[in-house]
């Protein structure tokens, strides 16, 4: 692992943990390094994981749960002498879940995790790179879009490709969709992990890309959808 990729687990430790779990039993949770859910939503996610029996890897970035402009937008990466940006961490969850869960703070070997046979689902913000990686490796996606084109990517996953779902919530007293709670999250995870058709479709679609993605398709949603449509005909 490169020295500038700070984390509390090495790649080998992550691999060995995955090796100890049944095939398709682990959900991988990562929201990227820029914008994630709020602190309150992270707490609901932690409750959902605590109360379930689900194996999971949860990646938490420095500054998670904070509002405002991410530090990655403001300039060069901080040096080793600078303090890490503090953020949300599910205190005590690792003790409660024991070996059922792996909570990674900092950088995670995403391709290693997604490509491992024990990984059976990906709870994702639906960022473009993460979405493409999951599609290419045949991993079903549970979308938690947060901004911009992530919502389009979530619809692509759920409605067009049919290789996953988007978390849904009920309606609040004001008639607008409310924030996700632990029950919404738990229901979405359970649905994703047990849906045989979604898993079969994800594996089937990944075989179309065993030779790789065209560059234009990786870089642009429109080109990718067009490429998918051509493959389907």
Predicted regions and their residues:
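Catalytic core of nucleotide-sugar-dependent glycosyltransferases
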Residues: 1-233
């Amino acid at each position: 692992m490169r020295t500038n990729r700070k984390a509390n687990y090495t790649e080998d430790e992550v691999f060995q943990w995955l090796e100890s779990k049944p095939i398709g039993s682990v959900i991988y949770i990562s929201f990227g390094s820029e914008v994630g859910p709020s602190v309150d939503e992270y707490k609901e996610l932690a409750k959902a994981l605590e109360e379930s029996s689900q194996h999971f890897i949860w990646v938490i970035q420095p500054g998670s749960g904070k509002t405002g402009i991410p530090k990655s937008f403001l300039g060069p990466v901080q040096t080793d002498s600078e303090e890490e940006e503090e953020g949300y961490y599910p205190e005590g969850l690792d003790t409660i879940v024991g070996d059922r869960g792996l909570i990674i703070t900092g950088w995670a070997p995403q391709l290693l995790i997604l490509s491992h046979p024990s990984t059976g689902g990906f709870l994702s913000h639906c960022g473009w790179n993460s979405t493409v990686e999951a599609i290419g490796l045949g991993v079903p996606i549970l979308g938690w879009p947060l901004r911009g084109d992530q919502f389009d990517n979530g619809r692509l996953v759920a409605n067009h490709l049919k290789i996953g779902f988007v978390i849904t919530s009920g309606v609040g007293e004001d008639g607008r969709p409310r924030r996700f709670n632990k029950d919404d999250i738990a229901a979405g995870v359970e649905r994703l992990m047990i849906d045989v058709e979604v898993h079969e479709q994800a594996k089937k679609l990944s075989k179309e890309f065993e030779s790789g993605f065209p560059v234009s398709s990786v870089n642009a949603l429109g080109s990718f959808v067009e490429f998918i449509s051509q493959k389907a005909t």
